[in-house]
Design a protein with these regions (language model features):
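Active-site rim helix/loop that mediates acceptor-substrate recognition in acyltransferases
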Residues: 14-45
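Conserved beta-strand in the GNAT
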Residues: 41, 47-55, 62-67
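Conserved catalytic-core motifs of GNAT/GCN5-like acyltransferases
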Residues: 98-100, 115-131
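Conserved active-site tyrosine of GNAT-family acetyltransferases
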Residues: 14, 109, 114
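A conserved beta-turn-beta hairpin within the catalytic core of GNAT-like acetyltransferases
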Residues: 56-66, 73, 123-129
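Conserved GNAT acetyl-CoA-binding A-motif
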Residues: 82, 89-102
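A short beta-loop-alpha structural element at the N-terminal edge
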Residues: 1-12
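Conserved acetyl-CoA-binding loop-helix of GNAT-fold acetyltransferases
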Residues: 68, 74-87
Length: 137
């Protein structure tokens, strides 16, 4: 089941997946509590196993902090989260969604119809990223 969650509910998955090699890294992201930001959680047996955050800016949205616990990867949870967000944004007549995708996640997003825009860049200390976008009709 996918539902809206509070920012603090994303922290455990962020820590385990997105910040696992950075024990002192804060799990709160800039903008987590902004009124134009929302968070989704994917629940299995009342446990959050997948998360993502969306920041709205006009009719453009940024997806960030997308993560699925390792033991639940490969079960289409990430795809379902992204598709849910796309449906929500499409119904609100958004024109574009974008993200800074880790280099290793590019094939996942390409399968969902996202395209690379621009050159590879580094977000320290995370690693190599690409801006990826998808336009809504």
């Amino acid at each position: 089941m996918i539902k809206l969650i509070a920012p603090v509910e994303t922290y455990s998955v962020r820590r385990k997946v997105l910040r696992k090699n950075m024990p002192d890294e804060p799990h709160q992201f800039h903008g987590d509590f902004d009124p134009e930001t929302f968070h989704l959680g994917y629940f299995l047996n009342n446990e959050i196993v997948g998360i993502l955050t969306v920041i709205k800016n006009g009719k453009i949205a940024q997806l960030r902090g997308m993560a699925v616990l390792e033991e639940h990867q490969g079960k289409n949870i990430g795809r379902k989260l992204v598709e849910k967000v796309e449906k929500m944004l499409s119904e609100e007549h958004f024109t574009k969604i974008w993200m800074n995708a880790r280099e290793t996640a590019v094939p996942f997003y390409e399968k969902l119809g996202y395209s690379i825009e621009g050159e590879i860049f580094v977000i320290k200390p995370i690693g190599f990223h690409y801006v990826m976008t998808k336009y809504f009709d």
